[in-house]
Amino acid sequence: MPSFDVVSEANMIEVKNAIEQSNKEISTRFDFKGSDARVEQKERELTLFADDDFKLGQVKDVLINKLAKRNVDVRFLDYGKVEKIGGDKVKQIVTVKKGVTGDLAKKIVRLVKDSKIKVQASIQGDAVRVTGTKRDDLQSVIAMLRKDVTDTPLDFNNFRD
């Protein structure tokens, strides 16, 4: 029976490359001369450092630009609040989201059931497995989900016959 998984996961290798490119651009830009602006990564947590709020916004813009060039959807980023760290310096923690959340998984299952397409959807941890008898039905479900779920980037993998 054909099936596929609906997942939401960023390519962490591309995220790391974008961070390295961002740090390189920040170190060479004239408006960051003599400042301690940088982006650090620990697992799925990015920390943005800057001298003030304005430069933090500039660092964020550089990072978003580099992520977009490397085809990483910026909807994966979850911004924390801006924290003061000694003097005028500020930092912001950005988390890279992974997996389909429980609410989104329920929404996907409801969308699939309401579509009246002859497929079954089940929640499997941080993914949603969609199973059907025809490959065409599965492809129409993929098209429907791409159209209806816009707040979170979705990937479709493990497409099996």
Curated annotation (Swiss-Prot):
Record's keyword terms, sorted: Nucleotide-binding
GO molecular function, one term: nucleotide binding
CDD domains, per database record: YajQ_like (cd11740)
Cellular component, GO annotation: cytosol
Family annotation (Pfam families): DUF520
Keyword Nucleotide-binding: yes
Keyword Nucleotide-binding applies: yes
Similarity field: Belongs to the YajQ family.
Function of the protein: Nucleotide-binding protein.
Name this polypeptide is given: Nucleotide-binding protein BamMC406_2474
Organism from which the protein derives: Burkholderia ambifaria (strain MC40-6)
